[in-house]
Amino acid sequence: MGNFIFENYGGIEGLYHVQPEVHSDARGYFMETYNYNDFKKAGLGMVFVQDNQSLSAKGVLRGLHFQKEHTQGKLVRAISGEIFDVAVDIRKGSKTYGKWAGVILSAEKKNMLYVPEGFAHGFYVLSDTAEFLYKCTDFYDPSSEAVIMWNDPA
């Protein structure tokens, strides 16, 4: 049933803006937020092993996080509010190493971003509050966690 539009984003290999099909009527709406078969057809046949959710106030900046070991691919979306989401390619040897892309994700638009393994990821809250949900391809490992400052000149 799930129909998704997958758009390579920012000219960065593996980074995808994802728009699910939303079925709306007088009662409200229904949508699939993930369907393994649809994602696999789009070349994104990853398996998610952990879901995380956060609530942040306006002006909060989270990130840019990554894990040196146990790298995580992430499918991220705002389930309330609006955020400016950023992914930075930190894959050594990548044609787009150091390149970043940002997109506004909102509960209203219901859009998502797939951030592949080997990227740093973060977001900035634009609305009064925002709830953020992300599916991960590997488990959180505090001993592997690292961060890049948002204003790092490199």
Walk through the language-model features, giving the residues of each.
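Non-catalytic, conserved peripheral segments adjacent to functional cores
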Residues: 1-108, 127-129, 136-154
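Conserved metal-binding segment of the jelly-roll/cupin
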Residues: 105-127
